[in-house]
Amino acid sequence: MSLENIINEAFENRAQISPGTVGAEVREAVAEALRLLDSGAARVAEKKDGGWVVNQWLKKAVLLSFRINDNRVMDGGETRYFDKVEPKFGGFGPEEFRAAGVRVVPPAAVRRGAYIAPGVILMPSYVNIGAYVDSGTMVDTWATVGSCAQIGKNVHLSGGVGIGGVLEPLQAGPTIIEDNCFIGARSEIVEGVIVEEGSVISMGVYIGQSTKIYNRMTGEISYGRVPAGSVVVSGNLPARDGSHSLYCAVIIKQVDEKTRGKVGINELLRD
């Protein structure tokens, strides 16, 4: 039976699985799935033919790992932890860090089962299990990357940014930030929203699946996806009767890679 089939079958019977009852085949299959995620050999979501495809069986493996493992004491350098998932860098020495090609500034924390590509800089931040952070990305101070979130190449997650995680409900897609995006300080992108390549999100913008995304150039309102090259700020849309207004995200312009390369981020956000 394939690794995927073992995971799928075990997940269907998860109510009967515990640390004391799990079989060796399932335990090893879950461990192998987490090794694949940890090394970047597999990822929860990948782009194919221009669209994002979610590998649900890998999400199932992450969820099963919580059922089959007890909490245990873990060393974490300056402190100790009591959890089901080991710290990714817990056993790293100088050679392992050089081979990984990442910078990890204390007290940044990454759980095993997350992939951190070469060239990534982790300021004091948090990356959860199943996440994928691609090369050249900066995860700035107090930013959090949730479970199974997918972060592209050369992305800047500014201070305090929250990228939402998603394990359940199982059918929910992960939050995705594509290549060359800038996410401004204290912004939150959650609930499987996709921010497409080259977009700039201003400081303090909150986008979930129910958030209206208003394109002021076309007057269109959309949900769940920020188109490529968008420059987005927070705003409000008035109610039909004029009695109140409700929060929305506003696309104020769209720029191509050439323009973005010539103009600074702050200049793009000025109107």
UniProtKB/Swiss-Prot annotation:
GO terms for molecular function: 2,3,4,5-tetrahydropyridine-2,6-dicarboxylate N-succinyltransferase activity; nucleotidyltransferase activity. Keywords: Acyltransferase, Amino-acid biosynthesis, Cytoplasm, Diaminopimelate biosynthesis, Lysine biosynthesis, Repeat, Transferase. InterPro entries: DapD_Trfase_Hexpep_rpt_fam, Hexapep, Hexapep_transf_CS, THP_succinylTrfase_dom1, THP_succinylTrfase_N_sf, Trimer_LpxA-like_sf. It is found in: Cytoplasm. The keyword Amino-acid biosynthesis applies. Signal peptide: none annotated. Pathway: Amino-acid biosynthesis; L-lysine biosynthesis via DAP pathway; LL-2,6-diaminopimelate from (S)-tetrahydrodipicolinate (succinylase route): step 1/3. Its EC number is 2.3.1.117. One of its GO terms (biological process) is diaminopimelate biosynthetic process. Its main location: cytoplasm. One of its GO terms (cellular component) is cytoplasm. The keyword Chloroplast does not apply. It is an enzyme of class 2 (transferase). It catalyses: (S)-2,3,4,5-tetrahydrodipicolinate + succinyl-CoA + H2O = (S)-2-succinylamino-6-oxoheptanedioate + CoA. It comes from the Bacteria. Homotrimer. Belongs to the transferase hexapeptide repeat family. This is 2,3,4,5-tetrahydropyridine-2,6-dicarboxylate N-succinyltransferase. It comes from Methylococcus capsulatus (strain ATCC 33009 / NCIMB 11132 / Bath).
